[in-house]
C-alpha cells in the first residue's frame, strides 16, 4: 500500500481533523478547551503531517520536538483509516519522519485506560520504556500514562 505523507500548515484542515467527533475525545483531557474553541499551534517547530491513501485523506500526525532529535507524536487518524490501513500508515510514517527530518527518536504518552492506543503504538513498532503515574486527568479521574518510543536505528533494521 503506497501512502503519501506531506507536511501541512493548513490550520483549518488540521483543526477539522483533530476536532473530528471520533478523534477529539481521545486526544483531549479535562483541561483542553472545547473543540469549537481549540486551535492548533501555529509554530514552525511543530510538524503536522497529513497522510493520504491515493486521494483519500486518512488523518494526520502531530510531531512536537522535545529536543532536536527526540520528537513527541500525537496520532489523529480518521475512522476511514482505522484497522489495517492505520497500522500500515503508522509504520510508514515513522520511516517518513526519520527520512525527512532530523528526528532520531519518536516518543508518545498513552493514558492507561486507552488499550486500543497502546496496542496501536506497539503494533507500529514502539516499545514501552516507562510509566508516568498520575499524570493525565480525564473525566475527573487521574490516570497514569505508558511511555513508548521508537528509534531510527531500531525501526530501520
Which functions belong to the PLM regions below?
Residues 109, 127-143:
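Conserved catalytic-core motifs of GNAT/GCN5-like acyltransferases
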Residues 56-59, 116, 142:
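Glycine-rich acetyl-CoA-binding "A-motif" of GNAT/NAT acetyltransferases
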Residues 38-50, 59:
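A short helix-loop-beta-strand connector motif used in the catalytic cores of GNAT acetyltransferases and
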Residues 68-80, 109-111:
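Conserved acetyl-CoA binding element of GNAT-fold acetyltransferases
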Residues 107-119, 135-136:
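Conserved beta-strand-loop-alpha-helix junction that forms the acyl-donor binding cleft
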Residues 1-32:
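Short amphipathic alpha-helix that is part of the acyltransferase structural core
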Residues 50, 55-64, 71-72:
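Conserved beta-strand in the GNAT
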Amino acid at each position: 500500500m503506497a501512502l503519501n505523507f506531506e507536511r501541512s500548515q493548513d490550520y483549518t484542515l488540521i483543526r477539522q481533523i483533530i476536532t473530528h467527533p471520533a478523534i477529539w475525545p481521545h486526544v483531549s483531557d479535562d483541561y483542553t478547551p472545547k473543540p469549537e474553541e481549540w486551535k492548533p499551534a501555529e509554530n514552525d517547530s511543530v510538524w503536522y503531517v497529513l497522510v493520504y491513501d491515493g486521494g483519500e485523506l486518512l488523518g494526520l500526525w502531530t510531531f512536537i520536538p522535545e529536543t532536536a532529535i527526540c520528537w513527541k507524536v500525537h496520532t489523529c487518524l480518521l475512522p476511514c483509516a482505522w484497522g489495517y490501513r492505520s497500522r500500515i500508515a503508522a509504520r510508514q510514517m515513522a520511516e517518513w519522519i526519520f527520512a525527512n527530518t532530523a528526528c532520531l527518536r519518536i516518543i508518545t504518552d498513552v493514558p492507561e485506560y486507552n488499550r486500543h492506543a497502546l496496542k496501536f503504538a506497539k503494533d507500529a513498532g514502539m516499545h514501552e520504556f516507562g510509566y508516568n503515574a498520575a499524570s493525565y486527568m480525564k473525566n475527573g479521574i487521574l490516570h497514569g500514562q505508558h511511555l513508548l518510543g521508537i528509534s531510527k536505528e531500531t525501526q530501520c533494521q
